[in-house]
Amino acid sequence: MWFWFSLIALICWSGSDLFSKIGCQDADDKYSHLKMVMAVGLVMGLHAAYEIFINGTEINGSIILTYLPVSLLYISSMTIGYIGLRYIELSISSPICNSSGALVAVLALATGGLGELVPAQLAATALVCVGVIGLGIVEAREDNDLRAARQQASNHRYAKSALALILPVIYCLLDALGTFADSRVLEALNEDSANCAYELTFLLAGIVCFVYVVLIKKSRLVPKREGPKYAGAVCETAGQFAYIYALADTEHVALAAPIISAYCVASVLWSRIFLKEKLSWKHYAMIALVVAGIVILGVYDA
């Protein structure tokens, strides 16, 4: 079953990328990112309720507070990522956002973890860093006429913008810090309890966003626009569920991890098929470096 859970995680998380992009890309809705937080908060809250009341997962105020710094880092990173989806192609955003594993390796080095990393992991980290920096250079130097020409068939047009690259990078930094902190906090907490604490904190964030967006700012919730957000939220939560079960099969973790870590490849594919995004060969070359590094890190993470 590990293989099918791995595929489900890959499909769901790449689907979350796609639906989140569709739900957050409208520039005329300045609260779309907060509405996405509302959607994810609701779905995660429902899943937390299932885990607590049906599966009997232990949760209390102490656990929630202990895990709170990690939860806030993850939630902040996702919110920043949702904002960034307005300004840049998913084909570029997803590989950058999913490069956080390389930054975790860098953090491990900075805190004295050099002995725990093998040369292949260092090489993979270098590949990811070169690829992300290369994507930034390609984006910055691309001729405006060539950009307009390749975006001709796309559903949206994106102007050259420093913000477009900065936001996915901020997501990557915050997610890496969250993952690094996660590894420390989970030494004292049960993983299921920590996940419930995260989901309940996300639910609270969603409620706060609802109060601000709907009750204070009086922004309307249009079903046609909100639908993709909730589809993305379901995919995000289902992907997390499948991920846990895929890695629970300890005999096949070394095979499951790289399959799941390559979900940004599927995100690039979906963006090409459904969003009609088209990049230059230089973009794809840099993305290939990032993906190769992510997959190698996934193998050794197992």
Please annotate each region the language model reported:
Residues S14, L18, A49, S71, ...:
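Hydrophobic/small/kink-forming positions within alpha-helical transmembrane segments
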Residues M1-W13, N60-Y74, V118-V130, D192-A205, ...:
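Structural signature of hydrophobic alpha-helical transmembrane segments
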